[in-house]
Design a protein with these regions (language model features):
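A glycine/threonine-rich phosphate-anchoring loop and its flanking beta-alpha core
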Residues: 53-124
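N-terminal small/polar loop signature for handling phosphorylated ligands or for N-terminal nucleophile
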Residues: 1-56, 65-66
């Protein structure tokens, strides 16, 4: 098994991070996405997973969710409990070049499995 990492996902994930993740998935024939972090990491992973199965710019999928026809399987390990992203089909992505922040949703972006160790949330 080969593992590829997309690190440095900031709060309010940016479309640039999504594009980088999609490129990583396509160039390396990645077949699943594991998000380890909080809601921003999981939101980014969801759109990366959908974008990896789409031929255009992943921003298209943010502003036009009906174009999401499939996504790579998504799994999450939640380290910060706050947004509910680990159990839903929604994601919020920002494009700072346009000063826009959009929500998108698709059943294809719902994580297949999520793990939560409550000890990670004691300090929240």
């Amino acid at each position: 098994m080969e593992i590829f990492e997309l690190s440095g996902i900031a709060p309010n994930p940016k479309i640039e991070s999504v594009r980088e993740g999609v490129k990583l998935c396509k160039e390396n024939s990645i077949d699943m996405v594991l998000a380890i972090g909080g809601g921003s990491v999981i939101d980014c992973a969801k759109v990366v997973a959908a974008g990896a199965c789409y031929d255009g710019d992943p921003w298209d999928l943010v502003i036009t969710p009906r174009w999401i026809k499939k996504a790579l399987p998504i799994y999450s390990v939640l380290t910060l409990s706050a947004t509910g992203s680990e159990m839903d089909k929604f994601a919020v992505i920002s494009d700072m070049s346009k000063n826009e922040k959009w929500g998108t949703a698709s059943d294809h972006m719902k994580p297949k499995m999520s793990i939560l160790d409550p000890e990670y949330t004691y300090s929240v």
